[in-house]
């Protein structure tokens, strides 16, 4: 499970600059849910083998009437609660302020791992300006320059150190045991809890909460027709006696983590509300993560024929990038249409892990080129030689040849369609990578 780092601090200390540095670019922002997570942004970061989620909490300016805690509760408190470690950003050039003291007092009371980052410290590593921040009682001040990238790598190492992260291979333990890890993702009140409880009731399971750290999602193991599953909860599933009580509490971090750790994601939509921006955000993250996906539209019984037609068009338009995903229309409350979901989930899992032999891929590639060759780009005509599989979950096909950087997106989609049809790839993204062979005569010509 990816650890979560929250960036906390008063306005204009450089949190957003540090956020963009950690996530490499502004394009790395994966979720910005208006209204729900106002003034908080979520992004992906990576250091070495370890990936992590970063939360930029935005600044806050407490006034005399509201006080620090009310303002913290509105924006920052939720992010801090979701985080495994807090990076408290201060402005070395601006100096220590009363707000810094207020924030430090709050963080100390939480008892959560905290790293103090002295930003804007270009050329001030040994300056007396750093000394005053020791008054905050949060230990050593680590000088960084978010704008120039100085000290950022060591800051991340320090933040991740107390979390005792497992080796990457341990994350794949469930896959080795042929267990399908299934995450049910969706906005609040789309019916995730109802669907989960219906499943558990149908299977008459003795389910249990698996113990884990604060960053672990709750998992419910169960078996259906001989296939083992592990349901990753994003709805706040809790046990009450022998009955599970699901609490719909939307957490962006929990949703992102569940998607990352799943083999298959069931994206649940609400037929009565259509496809919203939040739905599209979640769908986009599923695609970005490379997870297999099945789409289910819940509360299908609550809309008339005209509403159904409008919804189908909305899905085709707003979620066109998931057109490879099986689409189901269900009513979790009335238990209608739920059975066929399992077939699609298993099919998506098998597609994501399908092995594709090199001879077959190369034959399909050659047949595709004979049927329709890639267009010339100026004086360059891409020449494709052979293909092989470069990975699974999601499946990756690597194509080798010359001048492949000139292959158009339209031609890649043409190839994707042919590969999908041959290998019956349903419910999984398919990534096609082009590798241009180096010219062995380049060095001789330049010598």
From Swiss-Prot:
Pfam entry (one): KH_dom-like
Residue span(s) of domain EngA-type G: 3-167, 180-353
UniProt xrefs under InterPro entries: G_ENGA (IPR031166), GTP-bd (IPR006073), GTPase_Der (IPR016484), KH_dom-like (IPR032859), KH_dom-like_a/b (IPR015946), P-loop_NTPase (IPR027417), Small_GTP-bd (IPR005225)
Ranges that cross the membrane: none
SUPFAM superfamilies reported for this sequence: P-loop containing nucleoside triphosphate hydrolases
Domain KH-like span(s) in chain numbering: 354-438
Keywords in alphabetical order: GTP-binding, Nucleotide-binding, Repeat, Ribosome biogenesis
An example Gene Ontology molecular-function term: GTP binding
Residues reported to bind GTP 1: 9-16, 56-60, 119-122
BP GO terms, sorted: ribosome biogenesis
S-S bonds: none
Stored PROSITE patterns: G_ENGA
Function field: GTPase that plays an essential role in the late steps of ribosome biogenesis.
Subunit description: Associates with the 50S ribosomal subunit.
NCBIfam families listed in its UniProt record: GTPase_EngA, small_GTP
Similarity-based family: Belongs to the TRAFAC class TrmE-Era-EngA-EngB-Septin-like GTPase superfamily. EngA (Der) GTPase family.
Protein name, entry field: GTPase Der
Organism in which the protein naturally occurs: Acidovorax sp. (strain JS42)
